[in-house]
């Protein structure tokens, strides 16, 4: 699933504000859920995180095939990680993460199943989900008027946060216009998150090594 651009109802800040929360969860709901979730997703490259990732993959892999279909991933995100505490749009986010992991994993390694996520791609998928959630929290702080849309000035003020997060921008106006895919003059969360996650994964997203993978010890 691709990232959607802003449509007619979100081309003005008044239109967006009338819709309430971006996904049915309040900022407070997301902050509470994020404190738990950010520790529950083992996305780092250290040995401990990889060991946790192996165990998590096995829990997701209910069929014991060493490969995950979308339904297994979604069920695991609900039942094991309980990511629905953060968002009501979990199926859409997981679908994007699933597709992105397959695409990047196959591109980097030149191998992989077309419709399945294997262990070497599992970290990429977790990184995507983690980054989307982290960006949601960041967007909450960037969107100072609560309109669910970013203006250029709000984007410029957030450049230090974006650099700390892993995306360094030298020409804010040019980048903002690139993100604003329909030329509305404002940026939706979908536009912002699609751009930011793709940029970050290009820099620091890589598949897990096949050695010591999820099949070890099976």
From Swiss-Prot:
The keyword Transmembrane does not apply. It holds the Pfam family EF-hand_7. Residues 1-27 are annotated as: Disordered. InterPro entries: Calflagin-bd (IPR003299), EF-hand-dom_pair (IPR011992), EF_Hand_1_Ca_BS (IPR018247), EF_hand_dom (IPR002048), FCABP_EF-hand (IPR054322). It is found in: Cell projection, Cilium, Flagellum. Keywords: Calcium, Cell projection, Cilium, Flagellum, Metal-binding, Repeat. SMART domains: EFh. GO terms for cellular component: motile cilium. Ca(2+) 1 binds at residues 61, 63, 65, 67, 72. Ca(2+) 2 binds at residues 143, 145, 147, 154. GO terms for molecular function: calcium ion binding. It comes from the Eukaryota. Ca(2+) 3 binds at residues 180, 182, 184, 191. Belongs to the calflagin family. This is Flagellar calcium-binding protein TB-24. It comes from Trypanosoma brucei brucei. The lineage of its organism: Eukaryota, Discoba, Euglenozoa, Kinetoplastea, Metakinetoplastina.
């Amino acid at each position: 699933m691709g990232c959607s651009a802003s449509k007619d109802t979100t081309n003005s800040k008044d239109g967006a504000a009338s819709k309430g929360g971006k996904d049915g969860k309040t900022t407070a709901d997301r902050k509470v859920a994020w404190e738990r979730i950010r520790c529950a997703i083992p996305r780092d490259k250290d040995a401990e995180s990889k060991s946790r990732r192996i165990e998590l993959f096995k829990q997701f892999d209910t069929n014991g095939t060493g490969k995950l279909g979308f339904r297994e991933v979604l069920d695991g995100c609900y039942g094991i990680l309980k990511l629905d505490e953060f968002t009501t749009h979990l199926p859409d986010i997981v679908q994007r993460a699933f597709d992105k992991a397959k695409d990047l994993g196959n591109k980097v390694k030149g191998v992989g199943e077309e419709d399945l996520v294997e262990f070497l791609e599992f970290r990429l998928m977790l990184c995507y989900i983690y980054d989307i959630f982290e960006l949601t929290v960041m967007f909450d702080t960037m969107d100072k008027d609560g309109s669910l849309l970013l203006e250029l000035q709000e984007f410029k003020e957030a450049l230090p946060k974006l650099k700390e997060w892993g995306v360094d921008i030298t020409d804010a106006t040019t980048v903002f216009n690139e993100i604003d895919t329909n030329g509305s003059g404002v940026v939706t969360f979908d536009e912002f998150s699609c751009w930011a996650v793709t940029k970050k994964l290009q820099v620091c997203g890589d598949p897990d090594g096949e050695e010591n993978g999820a099949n070890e010890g099976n």
